[in-house]
């Protein structure tokens, strides 16, 4: 299973991402509420339809904020250039468990260091 970061979704919605399309057809994609929220903040063609479709995807386990703080400390993820939502996605991938697919290099490096990346 793959938890897909906003960067991958944005790329898919703009240009199409054949690997994501195939993974969707194979029921291999998980959604996170923060990713859905980030996508909802943008301008979307067929907005209602896209947001509804994304909301219907299976959801990864969401970590509580205190769990994410502990996760940051335990894995020494501070000072790595990732943000709070990134930290939530990493914790979520670890809890689910699943792989995290991102186009963001810093988030990808953090995922790889935790053996949660798509290239591991």
Protein language model annotation of sequence segments:
Residues 56:
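Conserved nucleotide-sugar phosphate-binding/catalytic loop shared by glycosyltransferases and other
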């Amino acid at each position: 299973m793959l938890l897909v970061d906003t960067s991958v979704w944005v790329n898919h919605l703009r240009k199409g991402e054949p690997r994501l399309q195939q993974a969707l057809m194979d029921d291999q994609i998980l959604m996170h509420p923060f990713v859905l929220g980030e996508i909802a903040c943008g301008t979307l063609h067929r907005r209602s339809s896209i947001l509804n479709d994304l909301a219907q995807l299976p959801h990864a386990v969401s970590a509580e904020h205190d769990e994410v703080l502990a996760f940051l400390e335990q894995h020494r993820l501070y000072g790595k250039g990732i943000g709070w939502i990134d930290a939530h996605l990493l914790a979520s991938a670890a809890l689910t468990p699943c792989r995290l697919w991102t186009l963001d290099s810093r988030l990808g490096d953090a995922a790889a260091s935790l053996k949660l990346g798509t290239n591991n």
